[in-house]
């Protein structure tokens, strides 16, 4: 047992300030030099993480405080990245539960806390943002206590210490109105209450790999906590897994420990510390690295199954290969299977077609982040509409995933939101009137019903609605849900959109393109005002004659086009439509590009339906 080490994960709902808190802990423990320029949210290292202000991958860091070494793991707050959180909990002995002093306990708080309590982790509660207008720290503490009781915490876990803080300003204290300009109360509480890691350094080595990193110089790096023994550089080890009998030998060519934000090479790393191991080819998450004298694999945490799937397809549009660097099915296949090695909550399967791969994940956000990442890496492909993964019980009844949805809205929009969710088969389970005229609504809603809801909520509440959801359980199928009530405007020829063609088309619906945009036959160029697909020609040019007429040369006034994000495109498309993704563009298109192909496919489906009825 190493008394001078503490391993802790920071868990919280999205946007409650985890990454900002880690920033302050690093600053105040002397990790950065006095003259060092440091960006905000230093733990969010990916471009997409910094742009969206969310954490996607959990990160490791370490601080030294009064002779103690505190290893900190910053975890994602979105339920879609819950697979990251679940396995990270295997590396730590305690959790720092961060709760917003205004918002209180949210669905993601419940999800991660349940996992932590089941694994017997010691909690420390930090009530953050106590300086926020409308903060209610004491009420939030009562909410946290009720949540602990509801989740079946034991007596030791219920006796949790509380620290109040404002991570943005770097202040903390044991009472909300007695804050000091330092993070010392948080450091002291961690050292006093979080147990030191168990294990005997005189026993043979045993490390469970919880995270994988990659380095161009040394290759794959396995990161995990040393459960017992000591890791020594250049020593032989055996890699094994609890799921199968196979063992393989390897040598630890390099060892790293975490100091601040850097990985530092070490000759030996002791029990209880978090270590990064290099030199083991093909190491993957869930494997155990042991000494050759005692090959004993450790069980890995159960990761919840994916709930949403979509097809990744080779791009077959007329513009294929113009903008992307990696466009073949082999490129896409290799990239997807590489993703699965580190993204434990994701699944990739081959399909009957060599050009399509079925990718399953925790939610729309989980999959759209992968699409955005691949796009930035130079990949070009098409994706289908996300579909919910159904199951059948022992009696053969159809089951579907149900999500617990929490919506915070101003009172005047409450009726509109409830009406919208009613059409999506949602059931209201709780309603809480909050201060400052807002209401918190809690629903049980099928995962199918959430597709496309986020953008509708923002429209209905004029940007004031906040939603978050979390997987609850599989329950009996709730019935059909009404889909998009409007059709698509489909380009009839390939060319360049121009003002004349767009002006004549805009009265039929809302447009997605502007003059000068390259267009191909079968591309979706707008949303029809009626519930049918209409073929339009936005490339049509005005015939030039040598006759002049008054009023014929007036300037054409065009309505500005709608610009969709990747998530909005995935929400908009129907089953017979695809989203084409390239490094420079995101376009929507029909699966069958020509009108003749679409009519043939429609007739084929109709004929199959008649045979089925007979």
Residue ranges and their predicted role:
Residues 258, 263-266, 399, 445, ...:
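Long insertion/accessory domains within large nucleic-acid-processing enzymes
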Residues 31-58, 81, 147-159, 191-205, ...:
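Active-site phosphate-binding and catalytic loops of NTP-dependent enzymes
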Residues 295, 303-437, 448:
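Charged, conformationally dynamic linker/hinge segments
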Residues 206-310, 319-322, 486, 494-545, ...:
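Conserved nucleotide-binding/hydrolysis modules and their immediate coupling elements
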Residues 1-99, 103, 143, 212-215:
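P-loop NTPase switch module centered on the Walker A-proximal segment
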């Amino acid at each position: 047992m190493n008394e001078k080490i503490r391993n802790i994960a920071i868990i919280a709902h999205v946007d409650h300030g985890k990454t900002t808190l880690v920033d302050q802990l690093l600053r105040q423990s002397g990790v950065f030099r006095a003259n060092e320029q440091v960006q905000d949210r230093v733990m969010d290292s990916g471009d997409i993480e910094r742009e969206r202000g969310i954490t996607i991958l959990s990160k490791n860091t370490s601080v030294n405080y009064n002779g103690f070494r505190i290893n900190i793991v910053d975890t994602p707050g979105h339920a879609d990245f819950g697979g990251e959180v679940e396995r990270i909990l295997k590396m730590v002995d305690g959790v720092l539960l961060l709760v917003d002093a205004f918002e209180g306990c949210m669905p993601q708080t419940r999800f991660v806390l349940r996992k932590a309590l089941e694994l017997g982790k010691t909690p420390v509660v930090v009530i953050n943002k106590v300086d926020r207008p409308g903060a209610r720290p004491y009420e939030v503490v009562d909410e946290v206590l009720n949540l602990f009781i509801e989740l079946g915490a034991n007596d030791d876990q219920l006796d949790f210490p509380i620290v109040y803080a404002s991570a943005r300003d770097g202040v903390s204290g044991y009472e909300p109105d007695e804050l000091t300009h330092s993070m010392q109360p948080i450091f002291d509480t961690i050292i006093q209450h979080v147990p030191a890691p168990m294990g005997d350094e005189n026993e043979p080595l045993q490390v469970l790999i919880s995270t994988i990193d990659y380095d161009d110089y040394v290759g794959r790096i396995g990161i995990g906590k040393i459960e017992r023994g000591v890791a020594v550089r250049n020593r032989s080890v055996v890699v094994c897994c609890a799921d199968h009998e196979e063992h393989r030998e390897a040598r630890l060519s390099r060892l790293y420990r975490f100091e601040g934000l850097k990985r530092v090479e070490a000759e030996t790393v002791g029990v209880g510390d978090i270590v990064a191991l290099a030199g083991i080819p093909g190491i993957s998450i869930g494997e155990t690295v042991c000494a050759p004298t005692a090959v004993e694999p450790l069980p890995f945490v159960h990761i919840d199954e994916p709930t949403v799937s979509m097809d990744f397809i080779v791009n077959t549009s007329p513009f294929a290969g113009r903008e992307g660097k990696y466009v073949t099915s082999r490129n896409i296949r290799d990239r997807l299977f590489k993703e699965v090695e580190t993204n434990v909550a994701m699944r990739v399967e081959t399909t009957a077609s060599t050009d399509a791969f079925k990718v399953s994940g925790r939610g729309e956000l989980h999959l759209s982040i992968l699409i955005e990442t691949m796009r930035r890496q130079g990949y070009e492909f098409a994706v289908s509409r996300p579909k919910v993964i159904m199951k059948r019980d022992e009696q053969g009844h159809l089951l579907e995933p149900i999500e617990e949805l929490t919506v915070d809205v101003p009172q005047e929009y409450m009726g509109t939101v409830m009406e919208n969710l009613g059409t999506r088969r949602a059931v209201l389970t709780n309603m809480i009137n909050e201060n400052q005229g807002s209401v918190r609504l809690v629903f049980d809603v099928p995962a199918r019903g959430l597709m496309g809801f986020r953008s509708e909520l923002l429209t209905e509440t004029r940007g004031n609605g906040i939603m978050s959801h979390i997987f609850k359980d599989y329950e009996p199928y709730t019935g059909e849900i009404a889909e998009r009530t409007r059709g698509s405007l489909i380009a009839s020829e390939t060319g360049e959109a121009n003002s004349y063609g767009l002006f004549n088309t805009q009265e039929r619906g809302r447009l997605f393109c502007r003059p000068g945009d390259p267009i191909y036959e079968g591309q979706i160029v707008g949303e029809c005002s009626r519930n049918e697909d209409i073929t339009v020609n936005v490339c049509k040019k005005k015939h030039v004659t040598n006759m002049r007429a008054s009023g014929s040369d007036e300037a054409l006034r065009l309505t500005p086009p709608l610009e969709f994000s990747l998530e909005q495109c995935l929400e908009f498309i129907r089953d017979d439509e695809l989203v084409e993704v390239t490094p420079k563009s995101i376009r929507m298109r029909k699966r069958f590009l020509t009108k003749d192909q679409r009519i043939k496919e429609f007739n084929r489906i109709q004929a199959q339906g008649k045979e089925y009825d007979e």
